[in-house]
């Protein structure tokens, strides 16, 4: 049950309103602030009963409107006056079924939507239901032909609409001239989207420490007229920029396609006639006609006297909590009318709507640089500093040797190329892009590549329940039948008390009709009954009532609804035996404690007493793969916390069925609304230890994410509504689930197109594989840079010699071209969350780089040894060619060491990586043998074989050292790479919580005073 504070809004909602810059309208502060919100309609006996609050606290039952014989009369009933409005085209009768009462709402969470991945059974069930309803619903159906008018005009910026412009004549509407004037002032009803400058976006990939060094190297190469080096460096820069730009552009295009779900048409009253126009043509002050199935195209205020609508606001809130709307209540853009009919005056369009303001807020927040980008920039900066230090040493030595300027520039270019991994951005971006493409095949759209790294390190997943953990599809359980009543009788009566109108069918009625396949006798009898009158759910009596005629002509009244209220109907008619009463109440309490939503069923034949038939439990069952997926997630070191709008009992029962922890609490205990007496540190402990929270509002989700992040966790958050956008933005990995609203998709890092938790866990495992590839490459590439920087720096300082500049460039090219294929490597996924442990990474890379430099130095020094058979390749090779081959082989093979979690033979590389390295090794060998470069000389095949053997020996030595260091806890401690225990500054947490409560208290007082 929603509790209201002094402002008439759900308690605690003032916090989320801060996220959305306050209330843009006069009436309701947010979609969840409507005073007629219903919760847990059917739950009694241990679970909260329904509470329906009216603005005027009249306590009267909702008005029931019977169908008008024609559209003119219908409009006359709907409008505040009795003057009829001329329709452009006469419509047929709407039938006898009333359409203004709310449906049976059973959940706080989002409404049922088509489930993918559940097999074809669900689709067959839907087709069966449609066929059944078509058969049952034999009344006249409405056919309206409307005229389409288009009046394009300039789109201006959205502005605040003066109240006098909203005083449109409800019987006539706006004139065409008034519409044109308002179009010029307020523009079209289209949300303004930030147009990305693709040129600026592309150029942004040329910015960064590593990119700056590459650009400096290209300038040096051009100055030295070394066009080969210049072309290679520019090609690497373009490769990196192109891959990154194309990937993000493709992700954005996919998301743009998902946004094409807005209302396209609208029925508007203009010049005294109701006509259908493009939704973009709506202007403030327009009178819109809303009926079942209408997607509200703008914000507005209901003006029909005594109107009563049931509105689905799941596109905004992400929850299917039924909302009842009355005269003067606010309708929000993108909400859907489920039942009822009314007229409204448009108060805001485009960016001035509630959804528009929320989207603007999310867009204004901007995108952070991303942790992975920071890591790469940090690595590039450190390597750049090392390059500068090395060059200072070389310049000092050159000063004493009077080295000419041209030679110094060559030294600078050489050290710059080998000291900073020019291909690092390209390889890493390619690796993530390939991973993102793979994730897209699994229905996970990565909106920014850095989200892959964030997802790999997630330790806690805050997941909603409906549609992610459960099917979001109500199903019926085993019924309880009063003695002497058969299940088929109970089912038949319950289905007779269900809507037969397909357009307004709610989840409860749909569940009953689906279940008919298990009750063949009831299904056969259902079509033989004639519905004389039908009254949808009454929020006061908490029942649905149907008056039917049996095949024998007998008239029967059928009801279903809240169990105790249905039972009270029978008790008011006659005394029920104590045994039946006790058994009935016991079943109600038992079902409520187990989290079922239960419905009582009763009937009364003419001239007879009311007869209680029994109780039908219904629930949203877990998805078939959820329990297994949760068990798998626990094995992956991932904790899952359930955040749901459902009642605590339902949440606990779902958690029990799924094998999750059952420490699920009411979100009010967080004390976010100014109440609560737990110190801040205890609240944080409470959140950290809890397995989930029930009856949550969006601000609770935001607070849970914030608290967990303060405790040092990487947190992922799932969401689907506009109000979830701040939480998705706050989380380290924001996940928009299948069916999410546009605002949620925009705020999320990853958009899932498939339902269920398994899709998220699959993406998490894939992200860890991608992270493993990136980590292996970064260690490899840093080691290579240090290898050549140490060797060439010492060689220049000690002997004033340098490897052929072309060979240095080819070494850099070969290293990066070969390892581009690491994006397709057979990488394992870690069994626990992975993070960048930079001290350990630098420690491993430095030791490996030193060992590589020592190996190359040994080859270099023995080549100048004097005497017979004293050197490794003495008398069989030329220095530059032999060094080029030895450096190329040992560096290329190093990737086979860093890519493995264990010994290098424990995991076989992919054929793409093996093939790329083999091709590069063959090219390096041919370069060495035939001297394919400027000033090159041929090398003996004997020298080549010896270098291959020597390089393999170096490879085995480094592999052993790398494995020992990787498995050594002492090395971890020595490098200070182990993450510290999460220390909690408890006094600070207490102070912050007290400050929040004081602020909330004063804010509430100020609003009450005003």
Swiss-Prot record:
What Enzyme Commission number does this protein have?
7.1.2.1
**Chief location of this protein?**
membrane
Q: Looking at the UniProt record for this protein, which Gene Ontology cellular component terms does it annotate, in alphabetical order?
A: cell division site; cell tip; plasma membrane
**What residue intervals traverse the membrane?**
202-222, 227-246, 378-399, 411-433, 806-824, 841-860, 913-933, 947-963
Source species, domain of life: Eukaryota
Query: SUPFAM superfamilies from the xrefs?
Result: Calcium ATPase, transduction domain A, Calcium ATPase, transmembrane domain M, HAD-like
User: Which is an annotated Pfam family here?
Assistant: Cation_ATPase_N
Acidic residues: which segments have biased composition? 42-52, 140-151
Biological processes per GO annotation: proton export across plasma membrane; proton transmembrane transport; regulation of intracellular pH
Key word Phosphoprotein present in the record? Answer: yes
Stretches for region Disordered = 1-126, 139-165
Q: Please list the residue ranges that the record marks as compositionally biased, kind Polar residues.
A: 25-34, 68-106
PROSITE patterns in the record, alphabetically? ATPASE_E1_E2
The residues on the Cytoplasmic side of the membrane are 1-201, 247-377, 434-805, 861-912, 964-1010
Q: Basic and acidic residues bias: where?
A: 1-14
Its membrane topology, per UniProt?
Multi-pass membrane protein
What's the PTM story here? In addition to transient phosphorylation of the active site Asp residue, this protein, but not the product of the pma1 locus, is phosphorylated efficiently in isolated plasma membrane.
Sections of the chain in a coiled coil? none
What reaction is this protein's catalytic activity?
ATP + H2O + H(+)(in) = ADP + phosphate + 2 H(+)(out)
Q: Which residues are annotated as active site? A: 464
One MF term from GO for this chain?
Answer: ATP binding
* Broad EC category: translocase
Q: Where does Mg(2+) bind?
A: 720, 724
Return the InterPro entries for the record.
Answer: ATPase_P-typ_cation-transptr_N, ATPase_P-typ_cyto_dom_N, ATPase_P-typ_P_site, ATPase_P-typ_TM_dom_sf, ATPase_P-typ_transduc_dom_A_sf, HAD-like_sf, HAD_sf, P-type_ATPase_IIIA
Name the UniProt record assigns to this protein: Plasma membrane ATPase 2
| Source organism | Schizosaccharomyces pombe (strain 972 / ATCC 24843) (Fission yeast)
């Amino acid at each position: 049950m929603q509790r209201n504070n002094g402002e008439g809004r759900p308690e605690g909602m003032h916090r989320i309103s801060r996220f959305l810059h306050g209330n843009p309208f006069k009436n309701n502060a947010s979609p969840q602030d409507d005073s007629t919100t219903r919760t847990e309609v059917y739950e009694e006996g241990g679970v909260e009963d329904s509470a329906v609050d009216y603005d005027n606290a009249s306590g009267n039952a909702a008005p029931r409107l019977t169908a008008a014989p024609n559209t003119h009369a219908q409009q006359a009933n709907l409008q505040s006056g009795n003057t009829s409005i001329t329709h452009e085209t006469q419509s047929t009768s709407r039938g006898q079924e009333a359409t203004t009462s709310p449906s049976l709402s059973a959940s706080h969470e989002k409404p049922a939507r088509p489930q993918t991945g559940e097999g074809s059974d669900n689709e067959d069930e839907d087709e069966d239901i449609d066929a059944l309803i078509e058969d049952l619903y034999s009344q006249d159906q409405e056919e309206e032909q409307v005229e389409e008018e288009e009046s394009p005009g300039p789109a201006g910026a959205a502005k605040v609409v003066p109240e006098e412009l909203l005083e449109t004549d409800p019987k006539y509407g706006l004139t065409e001239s008034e519409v044109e004037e308002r179009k010029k002032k307020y523009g079209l009803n289209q949300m303004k989207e930030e147009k990305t400058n693709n040129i600026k976006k592309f150029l942004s990939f040329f910015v960064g420490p590593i990119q700056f060094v590459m650009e400096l190297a290209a300038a040096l190469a051009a100055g030295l007229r070394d066009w080969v080096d210049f072309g290679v460096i520019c090609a690497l820069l373009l490769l990196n920029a192109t891959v990154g730009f194309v990937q993000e552009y493709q992700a954005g295009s996919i998301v743009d396609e998902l946004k094409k779900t807005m209302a396209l048409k609208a029925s508007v009253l203009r010049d005294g006639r109701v006509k259908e126009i493009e939704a973009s043509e709506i202007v403030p002050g327009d009178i819109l006609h809303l009926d079942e199935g209408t997607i509200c195209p703008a914000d507005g205020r209901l003006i029909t006297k005594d109107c009563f609508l049931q509105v689905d606001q799941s596109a905004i809130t992400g929850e299917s909590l039924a909302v009842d709307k009355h005269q003067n209540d606010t309708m929000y853009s993108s909400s859907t009318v489920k039942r009822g009919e009314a007229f409204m005056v448009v108060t805001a369009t485009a960016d001035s709507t509630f959804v528009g303001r929320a989207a603007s807020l999310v867009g204004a927040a901007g995108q952070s640089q991303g942790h992975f980008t920071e890591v790469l920039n940090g690595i590039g900066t450190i390597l750049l500093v090392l390059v500068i230090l090395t060059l200072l040493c070389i310049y000092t030595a050159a000063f004493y040797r009077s080295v000419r300027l041209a030679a110094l520039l060559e030294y600078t270019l050489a050290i710059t190329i080998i000291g900073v991994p020019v291909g690092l951005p390209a390889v890493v971006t390619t690796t993530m892009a390939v991973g993102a493409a793979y994730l897209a095949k699994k229905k996970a759209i990565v909106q920014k590549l850095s989200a892959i790294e964030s997802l790999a390190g997630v330790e806690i997943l805050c997941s909603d329940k409906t549609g992610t953990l459960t099917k979001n599809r109500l199903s019926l359980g085993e019924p309880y039948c009063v003695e002497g009543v058969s299940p088929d009788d109970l089912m038949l009566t319950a289905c007779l008390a269900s809507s037969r109108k397909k357009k307004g069918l709610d989840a409860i009625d749909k569940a009953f009709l689906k279940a008919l396949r298990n009750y063949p006798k009831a299904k056969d009898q259902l079509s033989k009954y004639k519905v004389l009158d039908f009254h949808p759910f009454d929020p006061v009596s908490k029942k649905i009532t149907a008056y039917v005629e049996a095949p024998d002509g007998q008239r029967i009244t059928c009801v279903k609804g809240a169990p105790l209220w249905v039972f009270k109907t029978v008790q008011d008619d006659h005394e029920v035996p104590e045994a039946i009463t006790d058994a009935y109440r016991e079943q109600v309490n038992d079902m409520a404690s187990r989290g079922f939503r239960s419905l009582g069923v009763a009937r009364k034949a003419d001239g007879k007493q009311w007869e209680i038939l029994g109780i039908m439990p219904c629930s949203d069952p877990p998805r078939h793969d959820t329990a297994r997926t949760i068990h798998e997630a626990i094995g992956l070191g991932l904790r899952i916390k359930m955040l749901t709008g459902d009642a605590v009992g339902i949440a606990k029962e779902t958690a029990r069925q799924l094998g999750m922890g059952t420490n699920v609490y009411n979100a009010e205990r967080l004390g976010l609304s100014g109440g609560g007496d737990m110190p801040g540190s205890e609240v944080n402990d409470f959140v950290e230890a809890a397995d989930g929270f029930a009856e949550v509002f969006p601000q609770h989700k935001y607070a849970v994410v914030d608290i967990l992040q303060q405790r040092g966790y990487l947190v992922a958050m799932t969401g689907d509504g506009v109000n979830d956008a701040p939480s998705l933005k706050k989380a380290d990995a924001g996940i928009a689930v299948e069916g999410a609203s546009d605002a949620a998709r925009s705020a999320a890092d990853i958009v899932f197109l498939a339902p269920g938790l398994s899709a998220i866990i699959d993406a998490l495992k894939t992200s860890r594989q991608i992270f493993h590839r990136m980590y292996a490459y970064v260690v490899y590439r840093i080691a290579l840079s240090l290898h050549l920087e140490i060797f060439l720096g010492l060689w220049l300082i000690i002997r004033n010699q340098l490897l052929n500049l072309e060979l240095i460039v080819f070494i850099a090219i070969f290293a990066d071209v070969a390892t581009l294929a690491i994006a397709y490597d057979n990488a394992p996924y870690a069994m626990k969350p992975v993070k960048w442990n930079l001290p350990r990474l630098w420690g491993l890379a430095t030791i490996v780089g030193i060992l590589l430099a020592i190996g190359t130095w040994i080859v270099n020094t023995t080549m100048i040894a004097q005497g017979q058979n004293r050197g490794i390749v003495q008398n069989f090779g030329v220095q530059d060619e032999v060094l080029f081959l030895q450096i190329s082989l040992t560096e290329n093979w190093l990737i086979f060491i860093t890519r493995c979690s264990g010994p290098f033979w424990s995991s076989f590389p992919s054929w793409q990586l093996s093939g790329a390295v083999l091709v590069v090794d063959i090219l390096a060998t041919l370069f060495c043998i035939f001297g394919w470069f400027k000033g090159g000389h041929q090398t003996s095949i004997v020298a080549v074989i010896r270098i291959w053997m020597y390089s393999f020996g170096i490879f085995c030595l480094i592999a052993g050292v790398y494995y020992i260091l990787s498995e050594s806890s002492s090395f971890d401690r020595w490098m200070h790479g182990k993450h510290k225990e999460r220390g909690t500054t408890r006094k600070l947490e207490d102070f912050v919580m007290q400050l929040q409560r004081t602020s909330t208290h004063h804010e509430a007082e100020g609003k009450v005073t005003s």
